């Protein structure tokens, strides 16, 4: 029976992945800031605490979804937190996974790691431009380092770059916009031809599991 370790299982996408895994024949362990009494949990705050090697014991596949995405209240501290959580902790986890003999490491990154679309066209896997913000830059840096770890080991590294994720209980700007529309805050706007790529959270978690 396969054993999976999930980081970020309390988040929007991670909680749906956990629900999907509950319906499969597998063993599940979690890496979280707070204990989950329903699962074997290693309590660890990524970017602040050292990750225990024991968290990777007997794990076949790691689903790494945890990351730092927003902090509008403390801009002076943002850069350091992004680096420590999105890059340093990701690399630390992957290196421990290699030590523990983990076979697959699945990193849920972001479409922002690929930078903006080139010449207004849809992006593909081979399109790469410079990420605009610190979030995209740190996700890209983590991707590069993970691929290098994968090349130097027997652990297979997969990277998924989701576009904007929507679905029940979604957080972030999309949810704020939809709430504003429902409350009548947004007047009707003329057609301007803007398009935005999106993916439903359940489609995303099925894709994540398919990669495993």
Regions inferred by a protein language model and the residue ranges of each:
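Alpha-helical substrate-binding/gating segment
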Residues: 178-186, 196-212
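Rossmann-fold cofactor-recognition segment
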Residues: 35-50
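Conserved Rossmann-fold NAD(P)-dependent oxidoreductase catalytic core, especially the SDR/UDP-sugar
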Residues: 91-134, 150
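N-terminal Rossmann NAD(P)H-binding glycine-rich loop of SDR-like oxidoreductase domains
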Residues: 3-24
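NAD(P)H-binding glycine-rich loop region in Rossmannoid oxidoreductase-like domains
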Residues: 46-88, 92, 96-99, 113-114
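Catalytic helix-loop patch of NAD(P)-dependent Rossmann-fold dehydrogenases
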Residues: 84, 118-165, 170, 186-190
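Conserved loop-to-helix N-cap of the C-terminal "lid" that shapes the substrate pocket in Rossmann-like
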Residues: 159, 168-171, 192, 197-205
């Amino acid at each position: 029976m396969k054993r999976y370790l999930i980081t970020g299982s309390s988040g929007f996408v991670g909680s749906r992945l956990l629900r999907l895994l509950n319906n499969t024949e597998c063993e599940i362990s979690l890496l979280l800031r707070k204990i989950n009494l329903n699962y074997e949990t290693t309590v660890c705050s990524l970017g602040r605490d050292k990750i225990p090697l024991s968290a990777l014991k007997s794990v076949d596949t790691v689903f790494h979804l945890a990351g730092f995405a927003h902090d509008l209240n403390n801009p002076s501290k943002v850069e350091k937190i992004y680096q420590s959580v999105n890059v340093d902790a990701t690399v630390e986890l992957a290196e421990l996974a290699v030590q523990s003999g983990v076979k697959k490491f699945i990193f849920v990154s972001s479409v922002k790691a690929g930078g903006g679309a080139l010449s207004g066209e849809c992006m593909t896997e081979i399109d790469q431009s410079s990420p605009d913000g610190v979030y995209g830059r740190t996700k890209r840096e983590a991707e590069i380092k993970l691929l290098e770890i994968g090349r130097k080991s027997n652990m297979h590294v997969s990277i998924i770059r989701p576009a904007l994720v929507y679905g029940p209980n979604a957080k972030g700007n999309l949810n704020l916009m939809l709430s504003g529309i429902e409350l009548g805050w947004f007047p009707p706007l003329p057609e301007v031809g803007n398009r935005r790529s999106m993916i439903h959270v359940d489609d995303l978690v099925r894709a994540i599991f398919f990669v495993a």
